[in-house]
Amino acid sequence: MTPIVAVVGATGTGKSALSLDIAERLRAEGRAAEIVNADAMQLYRGMDIGTAKLPEVGRRGVPHHMLDVLDVTAEATVAAYQEEARRAIGGILERGAVPILVGGSGLYVSSVLFDYDFPGTDPEIRQRLERELEATGPGMIHRRLRELDPVAAQRIGAHNGRRLVRALEVVEITGPQPERATAEPRPWHPARILALTLPREELVPRLDARVSGMWRDGLVDEVAGLLSAGLADGVTASRAIGYAQAARQLAGELSEEEAMEETRALTRRYARRQVSWFGRYADAVRLDARDDRLLEHALDALPAARP
């Protein structure tokens, strides 16, 4: 059975480049491959510079899925993503190609790879919890979640208010889960996970340089255009790292240097969470992103995907 190839890792480790290299090599060997995005912010049309989204010309003729599928005013939900991404993967498999899942949004990746089930939503509960978040901050929500679902509280951390609200909403809908099993759920489909790693002392300078490049490449102008398209009303998109800071710069709330430095700090924190999340994938093949033979080592781990 053709497996899903998942290329995961922290921001700045070279996931997109490796996924394209794998797809090109498979194509040269007579096996088609298609890429499925698993970066939550790359779902949004027009959010290109700040998400390091590959332009069409940079995709080397490899079909890509789950890019530019939402307006910035729409809310991204992992449940909707799971459904659409799995549908895309099903189509790829039917065409006899190899699906390559690529991204750093941990829950989005896991929602595809594993047998996750996402409860529905309750607008009244959600609105009440969002009011509480606005009034008290994420710390209080996190403490409540820790009492009711300690596994979720530990996974999310104390700062991600939007995800804490969603987790507490799920608990209120489904009931407390103080003893929920911590074992990874069953795989949805056979998969080979390639996890790119990089020492923190080398990753941080890459991340800082990436943020500087975002501003140099025109992130502020991109955000100005998105604000006219309703970015400020987007529950998910308006909070994206870099975009929120550029919007505050445009509003005169931050200087350019303050906006960049806040983005750097948040990007470093996000990368730490990514490393922690993907570190829990026990069956992943760990690959050093600095390796001169990275592609060869990645392909060595994919015998079932090759002709």
UniProtKB/Swiss-Prot annotation:
Top-tier EC class: transferase
GO biological processes: tRNA modification
Transferase among keywords: yes
Entry keyword set: ATP-binding, Magnesium, Nucleotide-binding, Transferase, tRNA processing
Cofactor (UniProt): Mg(2+)
Binding positions for substrate per the UniProt entry: 11-16
Catalysed reactions, as listed in the record: adenosine(37) in tRNA + dimethylallyl diphosphate = N(6)-dimethylallyladenosine(37) in tRNA + diphosphate
A molecular-function term among this protein's GO annotations: tRNA dimethylallyltransferase activity
InterPro entries: Dimethylallyltransferase, IPT, P-loop_NTPase
Cystines in this chain: none
Binding site for ATP: 9-16
Description of how the protein assembles with itself and partners: Monomer.
Family that this chain belongs to: Belongs to the IPP transferase family.
Function: Catalyzes the transfer of a dimethylallyl group onto the adenine at position 37 in tRNAs that read codons beginning with uridine, leading to the formation of N6-(dimethylallyl)adenosine (i(6)A).
Protein name according to UniProt: tRNA dimethylallyltransferase
Gene source species: Clavibacter sepedonicus
